[in-house]
Amino acid sequence: MLSLESEVLTRHLPLFANKSILLFGDVRDRFADQIKANAKSVAVFSSYFDYARQYADVSFGLYCEIKAELAVFYWTKNKQECQYQLLQWLSQVDVGQEMLIIGENRAGVRSVEKLLEPYGNIAKIDSARRCGLYHFELQSVPDFDGKKFWKSYRLQDLNIFALPAVFSSAELDGGTQLLLSTFNKADRLKGKVLDLGCGAGVIGASLKQQFEKIKLTMSDIHAMALESSRHTLAENALDGTVVASDVFSNIEERFDLIVSNPPFHDGIDTAYRAVEDLIAQAKQRLNRGGELRIVANAFLPYPDLLDKAFGSHQVIAKSNKFKVYSAKA
């Protein structure tokens, strides 16, 4: 099934004929298969591991270094993330480079005009399926300084670092704050700990600083989150392993504690699949007596999922908006 963005692109198939093509940005479907027959070559790059891991021909990472005669960028809802990815890629190509930018109107794709106007000619060439399609030709190669995109803030004795579109990138959110308040020195936490959906690394770094003897693993699907967590650990002189994983897809070991402020937003829609998989599979990923501890908006239907997977659960902290759940293997 094609996304709305790709449906619009199918109206312009002649543009892809006999050219090397790069698809990157928020690619979520197999539009590549639609154009392979007539294109010279098709490459796909994604910063989202949940998508990239499904297909052998999709490259995953933070920096896209793939060159092509025509690039197609799928706009994301986060303007700064788009700016980061577009300028990073355009900084390494030549004047005359052609690009198409496609995105939903509700995701703010219109702002690409102001973003790219300083670097070349941009024009809207189609509007359909509540999306806008733009053609861009590079006239002035931009300078890309990734350091300018980093945000940081102080959390007690920690410095937290984050790239665009990473959760808790500007300040500590209320849910994570409540979750962290449930840990104290008296717990004497030890063993293997997994911070799943680590974002900027707030939870994992906080626990590692508080409980030095734990063996910490941090995981996320977003390349920007993984880089942010690595940076947070390094800048605070903390040890930990950071891995790309779609829930447990790339994690084989068992843990004594799995802790998470799991996401329930997917782009500009709400999605629960990752959380459902986390709760359903966590018991098999815990050592005997191990614990799953998560925080969530109070209205979300997690108690039933926890009881189904673990047999029971406890609410160990709550506020007007959030609840912290604990379930033990």
From Swiss-Prot:
Keyword line: Cytoplasm, Methyltransferase, rRNA processing, S-adenosyl-L-methionine, Transferase
Gene Ontology MF terms: 16S rRNA (guanine(1207)-N(2))-methyltransferase activity; nucleic acid binding
A Pfam family reported for this protein in Swiss-Prot or TrEMBL: MTS_N
Localization per Swiss-Prot or TrEMBL: Cytoplasm
Top-tier EC class: transferase
Cellular component, GO annotation: cytoplasm
Coiled coil (UniProt feature): none
Domain of life (superkingdom): Bacteria
Predominant localisation class: cytoplasm
This enzyme's EC code(s): 2.1.1.172
Keyword presence, S-adenosyl-L-methionine: yes
Catalytic activity: guanosine(1207) in 16S rRNA + S-adenosyl-L-methionine = N(2)-methylguanosine(1207) in 16S rRNA + S-adenosyl-L-homocysteine + H(+)
Keyword rRNA processing carried by entry: yes
Family the entry assigns: Belongs to the methyltransferase superfamily. RsmC family.
PANTHER family noted in UniProt: RIBOSOMAL RNA SMALL SUBUNIT METHYLTRANSFERASE C (PTHR47816:SF4)
Biological role: Specifically methylates the guanine in position 1207 of 16S rRNA in the 30S particle.
Known partners and oligomeric status: Monomer.
Protein name: Ribosomal RNA small subunit methyltransferase C
Gene name per UniProt: rsmC
